Amino acid sequence: QEQWNEQGVKTAKELKKIVRNLDTTRLITAGMNPPVNMENQDVTLQFDKANVNYNVLAASGVLDLVGYNYAHKTFEYHQQNFPKTPFIATETTSGLQTRGYYDQKSDTLKRWPIRWDIPFDGGNSNNTVSSYDQVSTPWGSTHEETWKIIKKHDYLSGMFIWTGFDYLGEPTPYVWPSRSSYFGVIDLAGFPKDVYYMYQSEWTDKPVLHIFPHWNWEIGKEVDIWAYYSQADEVELFLNEESLGIKKKEGDDLHIMWRIPFKPGSLKAISRKDGNEISC
């Protein structure tokens, strides 16, 4: 709570002095949680207006670099509220996935639980969370939601994800017998979840083409097929060598999707740039 009063500013000054005595080269920040006033607001909502009420520490000028935990819809207003102070998103997303599990349909965003302080009685009976990037906590966002905002504005310097790896404890949105978190883009065994490839397609120069989910469903069931790709203009999807059409990213979307009825066989995707095959 001290970040919301003058004690927080005083403590920050004391800590900054200690750090400066040891290291004069690095910027000093704090992960403010939350950076804006959430009082009397439904916690399922994020601020989307420029006149947000920032906490005292954020507005004090003590920090070299303002750090935001969550509140992703306020990011784009940072420059007009703090024109001389750099920004970094110190904790973001809290997206939820279980590797290898997929709920249909995939184009509906879900916030699980509805509120952090209300017991969760929804979700899946086997305590899984869809591995499509469609579920997050109410205080967070999907990975695509936050990265699109950061990517759009040059004055937003970057983001730290909650989290890189799953870990034991905090099995949000579930309770026992769940024991592992669902937050990681890599699971406890070290295997990447699908959203890992979204970041790979955005943050590296490596040609990426990743399609999912698995291809083992009930005959006739409609299945959403996603693809993350980079270094290419388009992707063509094939089932048993029959084309299911060419897709391109639209607007600021970071993935493409086909919705098709399942039938047994082999899926294949080909990405192309200027008509030349890049990945298969």
Features from the language model and the residues they span:
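Extended substrate-binding grooves/exosites of carbohydrate-active enzymes
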Residues: 1-250, 255-276
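Short beta-strand elements
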Residues: 279-280
